[in-house]
Amino acid sequence: MTFSIAELFEQHSTDKFDLHERHLNNQMVRMLKTIGYDRHYQRAVGQYLYDQAGTEYLDLLSGFGVFAIGRNHPTVINALKETLTLELPNLVQLDVSILSGLLAKELLETTPDNLDKMFFCNSGTESVEAAIKFARYTTKREKIVFCEHGYHGLTMGALSLNGEEIFREGFGPLVPGCSPIPFNDLEALEKALSNKDVAAFIVEPVQGKGVNVPDDNYLPEVERLCKKYGTLFVADEVQTGLGRTGKFWAIDHWNVKPDMICMAKALSGGFVPVGAVAMTHKIMDSVFNRMDRAVVHGSTFAKNNLAMAAGLATLHVMEEEKLVENSLKTGTDIINSLNALSGKYEFLKEARGKGMMIAIEFQSPKSLTLKAAWAMLEAANKGLFCQMITIPLFKEHHILTQ
């Protein structure tokens, strides 16, 4: 009897919600059904999803930043098919692979020139976990400083650096020595670092939650202060990297040189998870400092051939299709066009962001009638007004966003 994924899809095309309710997270199913997002998607191409009726949906969530080159890009599909047909030796744990070496070389050509070593893992949160360990070992310090409202993942170490209480609630005690400070606040940062006992300061160049863009002097001063107090500067580019902000790395907007860059999401091409940390030679040599420490940190499936092939193909597509340049131009046009409407609509405060990493912020209107409606919604649930926009966008205009 042959095994066929296509047959499984055909047999169970309408079973996914029932299967998840029975065997997975039933609260996710309840939420989707409650807000009317319970669609049976059958196909995905580029930025579009298609349901059973052939209805086209514009996916602005992009898998939370995964699909920088669109869904099911043929170049990545062909690279994965070719990798499978070659019958390559994979995950030979007492060996090193060609593809991981090539991907490391390609990535390091895009990073600041002080970074010349790569560590591969399977996800963004794993890259943050690695950065925590590497920073502590290299500096011989325990403390990690992070930003309020920041997001770095949900595994225990990364969760300890999560600036949103809803994710942390009930999972303590978390990793000790992790302290939050306000984002874009240099005075708070210097105060936190001044005792010279902080291993690393980790920050998203543009915060993913809310798309908060720092002042132009912020990251250059972060770099200076970290050097002054012997703290490693870690840029979390899991959300912002690979062209999303209109530069290959968001840090390129400010020409800073962190000690480590965490990356993942878009590097996968939307297929095989891959995460990585770019770092200085000094950090790599400090952690992996003897032959008996050659495997002191790692992951079983890191550097697997499919993940590395997906990463190489993704970088090729980004260069060939000039996606970074397109992100800058298109994003600037969108932000400017939306801000031009702010005088026309009372609720619209501003559109902000970098490249195609964009947020629209709403505000309390001035007219009494609308102001009362706003106050009522805010009192009921602080995020309710935005839901009243995103749900009709989905149901009436077939746009998926949050």
Task: Give the positions of each predicted feature.
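Conserved N-terminal phosphate-binding loop of PLP-dependent enzymes in the Aspartate aminotransferase
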Residues: 2-402
